[in-house]
Amino acid sequence: MGRGGRGVGGGRPEGHGASVEGGRTRQTEGMDLISPDPGRWAARFDRHRWRIRLALPQARTEHIGSTAIGTICAKDVVDILVGEVDVTAAAQALVSAGYVIEGERPNHIWLCWPDPQQREAVVHVVIAGGDIWHQRLLFRDFLKRSPAEARAYEALKQRLAAQTDDWGEYTAQKAAFVARILQRAAES
C-alpha cells in the first residue's frame, strides 16, 4: 500500500525491536514503548498540525494520546485528533496530503503518516465537538492533571505491550481502564 492509498483494516502492525542504545526503548515482546520525550513529540505534532491545516484550514486539531501527556512512556507515534463536520471528506483531503487511511468506524477514520510500516503519526478524524472528540480530550486532560492515574496507565501499557504484539488486543485490553478514567473524569 503506497502513500495516499486506501487501506482499511482492524489491525495495525507494530515493530519488533531490540532495545535502542541510550535506554530510550523499553523492552517489549511486540511493541516498543520509549521513555517520555515531550519536546520531540510536541515538535512532531506541530509539523503535522501545519500539514493538516494546509489540507483542512478550518479543522480543529489537538495532540492526544500518551505522547500528549508527556510524562509517561509511549509508542513513538504521535496521535492527532482532527475535528471536522464531514469526516469522510476530511479524510480524503488528508489522503491527498499524503496520509494513508488505516481504518474506519462510524464518525471516525484514522490515517497514518508516512505509511503503516514506518508510522510516526496517527490522525483520528472525528466529528468536531462530537462524543469521540470530547472523550479523547477528557481522557488526555484527566491524565495530565492526575499523575498517579497517568503512572497506572503507563504500567498497564508496559504490561500489555510485553504480553502481545497484536494492536487490536493491546487496545481492547486498555478499554476497561479507559472507561474507568472517562467515568472518573466526567464526575470530577
Swiss-Prot record:
InterPro entries: GrpB/CoaE (IPR007344), NT_sf (IPR043519)
Pfam families registered for this protein in UniProt: GrpB
Signal peptide annotation: none
Origin: domain of life: Bacteria
Biased composition (Gly residues): 1-12
Ranges for region Disordered: 1-37
Stored PANTHER family: GRPB DOMAIN PROTEIN (AFU_ORTHOLOGUE AFUA_1G01530), GRPB FAMILY PROTEIN
Family indicated by similarity: Belongs to the UPF0157 (GrpB) family.
Protein name per UniProt: UPF0157 protein DR_2534
Record lineage: Bacteria, Thermotogati, Deinococcota, Deinococci, Deinococcales
